[in-house]
């Protein structure tokens, strides 16, 4: 949620930025009208409350003097009804303003390039040289099926399209990748490993910005009688970031760096017909997520660090990749600046996204009321939150299978993974 003071004091400027940079049309007339109502109702409520307090004192004094207070009590009842009505109207207006505010995307940082979609993203760097092969390259689907390790037919039987079953050495490599990533982030990058619920309540989803705008992208449970509704997490960012919801953090404890390996669940609404085969776009996939809660003056520096941590995974696995700065038209709803890391996939002869690292500024913190305070200070500040994939495990598996394939259909195990796979150096044929 963007700063409500910006909406009150710089509405026209904010609306223009949202239009140009986010292609978002803010209804300024409606917001202005609601803000006028809010001010009037606020004044009315405060005046009625002050008058009610004064009348209450007058009744007490009249009672001491032995006067008939029945008429005064009747007036108090009437004033109480007026106050209740005014408060209800004020609450309704505030709720309507809040709903509009929840629908507004974050404002991009000044250095984010203007653009309509991913074709206008800015490439920052390339690392590694794409592998060349002297044989016909196979895609990960063929490699996985030939190794008897990927079974998409079984996934479809059990659950439907965009599900897969992994077995044997492929399943072991999938697990090894997640363990390798967690060990790297906890032992070398200073993250605290966390285990979090895979089902979360709606307050948690509002906190990180999935609700109310992106409800259709989630898998929701049917609430039993007396139970609250839940949704399956689309990313560990949701529960991990919300660990600081409604918390005032000592600034000396910042930054807080957390990582978690979880399954992620996405409906992929709007992705019909895209990546229908293979592991690239699944309803259920694993990801190792990195989250940082930082001093609001240091979040851009933290974004560079966090992105570097994701890059380190690719570098240690010797997987060629490129780093791109997303343009305004390709950024996520809550982000003010995002880097994507795209790994080279030989079978597709292109780079594909494997990590997205974002600085959310104070957008999520304002929704969550996550704040920090220096020792001795009375005033609190909103923290800044960042998140990034470190990495998407399934897509990393795809990259390893395709980049490390051999002419006979076997796959060489990257050196970094061998300790996690019992010393195996080759899998498959």
UniProtKB/Swiss-Prot annotation:
Pathway where it operates: Aminoacyl-tRNA biosynthesis; selenocysteinyl-tRNA(Sec) biosynthesis; L-seryl-tRNA(Sec) from L-serine and tRNA(Sec): step 1/1
GO biological-process terms attached to the record: selenocysteine biosynthetic process; seryl-tRNA aminoacylation
E.C. no: 6.1.1.11
The UniProt record lists the keyword Cytoplasm: yes
Disulfide bonds: none
Compartments in which it is found: Cytoplasm
Catalytic activity reported: tRNA(Ser) + L-serine + ATP = L-seryl-tRNA(Ser) + AMP + diphosphate + H(+); tRNA(Sec) + L-serine + ATP = L-seryl-tRNA(Sec) + AMP + diphosphate + H(+)
Coiled coil: none
Gene Ontology molecular functions: ATP binding; serine-tRNA ligase activity
Protein keywords: Aminoacyl-tRNA synthetase, ATP-binding, Cytoplasm, Ligase, Nucleotide-binding, Protein biosynthesis
Record: residues binding L-serine: 235-237, 289, 389
Keyword ATP-binding among record annotations: yes
Any one Pfam family match given in the protein's UniProt record, by short name: Seryl_tRNA_N
InterPro entries with a match to the protein in the record: aa-tRNA-synt_IIb (IPR002314), aa-tRNA-synth_II (IPR006195), aa-tRNA-synth_II/BPL/LPL (IPR045864), Ser-tRNA-ligase_type_1 (IPR002317), Ser-tRNA-synth_1_N (IPR015866), SerRS_1_N_sf (IPR042103), SerRS_core (IPR033729), tRNA-bd_arm (IPR010978)
Subcellular location, principal: cytoplasm
Lineage top rank: taxon: Bacteria
Binding site for ATP: 266-268, 353-356
One term under GO cellular component: cytoplasm
Subunit structure: Homodimer. The tRNA molecule binds across the dimer.
Family assignment from sequence similarity: Belongs to the class-II aminoacyl-tRNA synthetase family. Type-1 seryl-tRNA synthetase subfamily.
Function: Catalyzes the attachment of serine to tRNA(Ser). Is also able to aminoacylate tRNA(Sec) with serine, to form the misacylated tRNA L-seryl-tRNA(Sec), which will be further converted into selenocysteinyl-tRNA(Sec).
Domain writeup: Consists of two distinct domains, a catalytic core and a N-terminal extension that is involved in tRNA binding.
Protein name: Serine--tRNA ligase
Native source organism of the sequence: Haemophilus influenzae (strain 86-028NP)
Gene: serS
């Amino acid at each position: 949620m963007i700063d409500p003071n910006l909406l009150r004091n710089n509405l026209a400027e904010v609306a223009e930025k949202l239009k140009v940079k986010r292609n978002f049309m803010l209804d300024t007339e409606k917001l202005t009208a609601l803000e006028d109502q809010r001010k009037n109702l606020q004044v009315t409520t405060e005046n009625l409350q002050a008058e009610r307090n004064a009348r209450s004192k007058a009744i007490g004094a009249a009672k001491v003097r032995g006067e008939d207070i029945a008429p005064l009590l009747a007036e108090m009842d009437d004033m109480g009804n007026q106050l209740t009505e005014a408060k209800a109207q004020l609450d309704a207006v505030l709720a309507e303003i809040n709903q509009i505010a929840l629908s507004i995307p974050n404002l991009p940082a000044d250095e984010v390039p203007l653009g309509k979609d991913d074709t206008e993203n800015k490439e920052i760097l390339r690392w590694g040289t794409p592998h060349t092969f002297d044989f016909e390259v196979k895609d990960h689907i063929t490699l996985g099926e030939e190794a008897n390790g990927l079974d998409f037919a079984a996934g479809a039987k059990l659950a439907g399209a965009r599900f897969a079953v992994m077995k044997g050495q492929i399943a072991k490599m999938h697990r090894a990748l997640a363990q390798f990533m967690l060990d790297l982030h906890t032992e070398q990058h200073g993250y605290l490993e966390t285990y979090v619920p895979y089902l979360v309540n709606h307050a948690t989803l509002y906190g990180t910005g999935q609700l109310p705008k992106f409800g259709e992208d989630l898998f929701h449970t049917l609430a039993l009688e007396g139970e609250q509704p839940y949704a399956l997490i689309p990313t560990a960012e949701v529960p991990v970031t919300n660990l600081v919801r409604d918390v005032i953090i000592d600034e000396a404890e910042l930054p807080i760096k957390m990582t978690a390996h979880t399954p992620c669940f996405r409906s992929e609404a709007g992705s019909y017909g895209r990546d229908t085969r293979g592991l690239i776009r699944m309803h259920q996939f694993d990801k190792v997520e990195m989250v940082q809660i930082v001093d609001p003056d240091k979040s851009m520096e933290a974004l560079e660090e966090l992105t570097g941590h994701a890059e380190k995974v690719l570098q240690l696995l010797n997987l060629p990749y490129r780093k791109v700065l997303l343009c305004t038209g390709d950024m996520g709803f809550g982000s003010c600046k995002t880097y994507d890391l795209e790994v080279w996939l030989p079978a597709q002869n292109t780079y594909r996204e494997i990590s997205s690292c974002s600085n959310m500024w104070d957008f999520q913190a304002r929704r969550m009321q996550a704040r920090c305070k220096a020792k001795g200070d009375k005033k609190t500040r909103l923290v800044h939150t960042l998140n990034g994939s470190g990495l998407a495990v399934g897509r990393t598996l795809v990259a390893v299978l395709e980049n490390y394939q051999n002419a006979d259909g076997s796959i060489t195990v990257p050196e970094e993974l061998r300790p996690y796979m019992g010393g195996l150096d080759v899998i498959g044929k």
